[in-house]
Design a protein with these regions (language model features):
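Beta-strand-turn-beta hairpins that frame and shape the catalytic cleft
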Residues: 47-52, 148-159, 256-260
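Conserved beta-sheet core of the metallophosphoesterase superfamily
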Residues: 107-111, 133-139, 212-274
Length: 274
């Protein structure tokens, strides 16, 4: 049975995760997000037609030349389930690729994964986008923030990036690992607060990491059970949602009844274009 890792903070975990005890607030006060999200943010809006989801891109522009991408039209939105990878070294070549992406007629919005340069990502300014907070990479490219809920085509999307690198030791030794890949308690608290405001009900969930309880279905091992895994298990039990999309596993597979591992597929969130 899955043991909720949050219990180490305040004893037995409450039956409903969406009411946090004061002790948890005291423990995490020192980890308050230093970025003040408020009046400095500007709203970035627009209309869209279809919403699609794909998996880890790892900075590979050839993915945008695949036949699956041809279905995207002007005004559509492509959601990426982590490891976007096009913001890595700030090289001239990388800037040229980002310029190409910025010329797409559709919007690209991604949650972060484990293989990201978080120092560079955090240099982009925060804006309000579709009811939530995102980092503005380009006029049509947005980095979705952990725990935010976005309203797209009258549907609510809960986004939560980050996770744990399986190649942590190698990447740490080579200087390509960032501590920010692992969600903080403050980010989880913000997510719970936003879910509370929406009565623990969203339409779709976009993450990089899969819920740990799916490991047998996926044929992969979750070697590290971090706070994010406990949090996701409680979302499964406590939240109402239609579909949950995640990357990380580099496979395209549907796990009944609501889970979608995505990699190279470009899946429509809904079945048909209006």
């Amino acid at each position: 049975p899955y043991v909720c890792i949050f219990s180490k903070f305040f004893g037995e975990f409450p039956r409903k995760i969406f009411t946090f005890p004061q002790k948890y607030d005291r423990i995490n006060r020192e980890q308050q997000n230093q970025t003040q999200w408020g009046s400095m943010l500007t709203e970035q809006e627009g209309s869209s037609n279809m919403v699609y989801v794909t998996g880890d891109l790892h900075g590979d522009y050839s993915r945008f030349k695949r036949p699956e991408m041809k279905k995207l039209r002007a005004g559509d939105i492509l959601l990426v389930c982590g490891d976007f990878g096009f913001i890595w070294d700030n090289s001239k070549q990388e800037q040229a690729v980002l310029k190409k992406l910025s010329e797409k007629k559709y919007t690209i919005a991604f949650v972060d994964g484990c293989h990201e340069n978080f120092d560079l990502l955090q240099q982009y300014r925060l804006v309000r986008w579709r009811g939530g907070v995102a980092r503005l990479i380009a006029p049509n490219i947005f980095h979705l923030q952990r725990g935010e809920i976005y309203t797209i085509e009258n549907q609510k999307y809960f986004a939560f990036g980050g996770g744990h690198s399986q190649d942590y030791e190698y990447r740490r030794d080579t200087g390509n690992w960032w501590r920010q890949e692992q969600p903080t308690h403050d980010e989880i608290r913000r997510a719970i607060r936003n879910l509370n405001r929406n009565q623990a009900t969203v339409d779709y969930i976009i993450t990089h990491e899969p819920p740990a309880s799916l490991k047998d279905c996926l044929g992969v091992d979750v070697q590290q059970r971090l706070e994010i895994h406990a949090f996701f298990e409680d979302i499964i039990k406590e939240c109402d949602y239609k579909k949950w999309f995640f990357g990380k596993c580099h496979m395209d597979r549907f796990i009944p009844m609501k889970f979608y591992a995505v990699f190279q597929d470009v899946l429509p969130v809904t079945d048909e274009r209006d």
